[in-house]
């Protein structure tokens, strides 16, 4: 489920727009970090992708924010660059664009950009750190060797005297055979453990600082927009369990200790030979002991294999785009056509005469079609609905750890970036649509969200003006926010939602007002309009 804050971050990134002149589409959006330690959602609100097309989208990142932000920044242009888009084939263009941006995430240039977004060190920086660490170790070893070279035998015996006593055979087992030996004695036997060489606990995965969104508030223009300011109370945490695992501990061994360890092993082998006779006399052979140890090792290895299967990130690359990814639901509006592409469990819903019409399909690993593809690619779905015990989605952009079957095309991998496409011809019955991440849909159904918005969209504020759409979204986010994190995680996720009206808001305003207007007000308004019209006619005749 990921880590949570002690108190939710309810700071919201919100905005409104009226659409482009040729395609008036009033919209409002809001995004909130909530209980999560970081914000991994992103979105696009682009009223004028081109002269006749608008684009609205939501990306729900996992394992970090980087892939979601990258998609928000580049996917609009990648869609427009597709050959099918230029030919007017929007469905094909969306499918090609999803696969194209997914493929770009494996290139070295994009991986570096993702690492910068995520705040992860690049390979070059890692190499520099390793070289610096090795230099420090070399300097320490040189100083130690120089010091010991100038010491007398008595001083050396004093320093390593505790290691010079012969250990009885029956108490020796296990000494000097550990994976992390301490300083070696003069006779080659292992000394006491050095606290500084204890195996460190597993480090957290790469941190990811949260942002409140990535949007375009411009009413005109085709760029994806700029990154919004981070909200307060942002946190840091490793990748969630759904897509990545903690890093394996790494312990550097100096050559000085390795050489000493080799000498210790030779001495121990000779002593082990002398111990075999005494063990045979007791009726318990070393061969039997070795067989038992082999069986134990086999059982431990099998347990380790199971653990690695449950945490796939341990074997995959720990780099952005491999252990992180994002859902994507993209809606294009051109004329009366609505085309929605979806990969993952974010969702687009249209209100049709007050009824919720799902324009996307949630992709879950346990679904029949998804399960068949996962198994065909060599994967499995665990009882809790996770692919190989990791990701609880079956389609996403990124997550290339799950896309390594070289015998299959990208769309047939365990996790596929190929979106489902739905098309709708808009009519007067279609009032608005909602695009949101699963932070909303896990709490409320499609119909519940439509009903909630329907009850608010005609409300007026204290000045008699229709409510801003963003204020309705903000209220929806607060409605979905869990009071605490004691439950199953419902209401504790990041939340991003966009409302897009298919009609200008002034039309909605007139419809809402007509039911409340008094007869006298209506007559006076009509009289004023007639006077204005007659004046215009006189002016024309003059």
From Swiss-Prot:
Residues 26-502 form the PPM-type phosphatase domain. GO terms for molecular function: metal ion binding; phosphoprotein phosphatase activity; protein serine/threonine phosphatase activity. The modification Phosphothreonine is found at residue 122. It catalyses: O-phospho-L-seryl-[protein] + H2O = L-seryl-[protein] + phosphate; O-phospho-L-threonyl-[protein] + H2O = L-threonyl-[protein] + phosphate. It comes from the Eukaryota. It is an enzyme of class 3 (hydrolase). This is Protein phosphatase 1G. It comes from Mus musculus.
């Amino acid at each position: 489920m990921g880590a949570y804050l002690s108190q939710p971050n309810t700071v919201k990134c919100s905005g409104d727009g009226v659409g482009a002149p040729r395609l008036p589409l009033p919209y409002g959006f809001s995004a909130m970090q909530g209980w999560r330690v970081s914000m991994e959602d992103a979105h696009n609100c682009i009223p004028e992708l081109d002269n006749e097309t608008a684009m609205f989208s939501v990306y729900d990142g996992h394992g970090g924010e980087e892939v979601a932000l990258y998609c928000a920044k580049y996917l609009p242009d990648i869609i427009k660059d597709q050959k099918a888009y230029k030919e007017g084939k929007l469905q094909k263009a969306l499918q090609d664009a999803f696969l194209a941006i997914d493929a770009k995430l494996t290139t070295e240039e994009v991986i570096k950009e993702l690492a910068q977004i995520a705040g992860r060190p690049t390979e070059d920086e890692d190499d520099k750190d390793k070289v610096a660490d090795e230099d420090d170790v070399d300097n320490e070893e040189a100083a130690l060797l120089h010091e010991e070279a100038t010491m007398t035998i008595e001083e050396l015996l004093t320093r390593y005297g505790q290691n010079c006593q012969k250990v009885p055979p029956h108490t020796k087992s296990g000494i000097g055979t550990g994976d992390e030996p301490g300083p070696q004695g003069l006779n080659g036997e292992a000394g006491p453990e050095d606290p500084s060489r204890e195996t460190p606990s597993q480090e957290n995965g790469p941190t990811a600082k949260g942002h409140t969104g990535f949007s375009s508030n411009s009413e005109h223009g085709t760029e994806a927009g700029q990154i919004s300011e981070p909200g307060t109370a942002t946190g840091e945490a490793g990748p969630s369990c759904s897509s990545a695992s903690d890093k394996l501990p790494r312990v550097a061994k100096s050559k000085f200790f390795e050489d000493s360890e080799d000498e210790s092993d030779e001495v121990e082998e000779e002593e082990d030979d002398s111990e075999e006779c005494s063990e045979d006399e007791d009726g318990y052979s070393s061969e039997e002991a070795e067989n038992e140890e082999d069986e134990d090792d086999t059982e431990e290895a099998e347990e380790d294999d199971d653990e690695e299967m449950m945490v796939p990130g341990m074997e995959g690359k720990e780099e952005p785009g491999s252990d992180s990814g994002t859902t994507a639901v993209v809606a294009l509006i051109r004329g009366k056509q609505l085309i929605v592409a979806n990969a993952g469990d974010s969702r687009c819903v249209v209100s049709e005469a007050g009824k919720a019409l799902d324009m996307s399909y949630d992709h879950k690993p346990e679904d029949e079609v998804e399960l068949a593809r996962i198994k065909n690619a060599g994967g499995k779905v665990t009882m809790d609905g996770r692919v190989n015990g990791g990701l609880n989605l079956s389609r996403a952009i990124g997550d290339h750890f799950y896309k390594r079957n070289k015998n299959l095309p990208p769309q047939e991998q365990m996790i596929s970036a190929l979106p489902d496409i739905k098309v709708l011809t808009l009519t007067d019955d279609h009032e608005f649509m909602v695009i949101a991440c699963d932070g909303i849909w896990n709490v409320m159904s499609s119909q519940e969200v439509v009903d909630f918005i329907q009850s608010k969209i005609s409300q007026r504020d204290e000045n008699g003006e229709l409510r801003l759409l963003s204020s309705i979204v903000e209220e929806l986010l607060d409605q979905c926010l869990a009071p605490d994190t004691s439950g199953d995680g419902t209401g504790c996720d990041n939340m991003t939602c966009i409302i897009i009206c298919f009609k200008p808001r002034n039309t909605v305003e007139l419809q809402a007002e007509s039911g409340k207007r008094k007869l006298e007000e209506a007559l006076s308004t009509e009289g004023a309009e007639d006077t204005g019209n007659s004046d215009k006619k006189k002016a024309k005749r003059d």
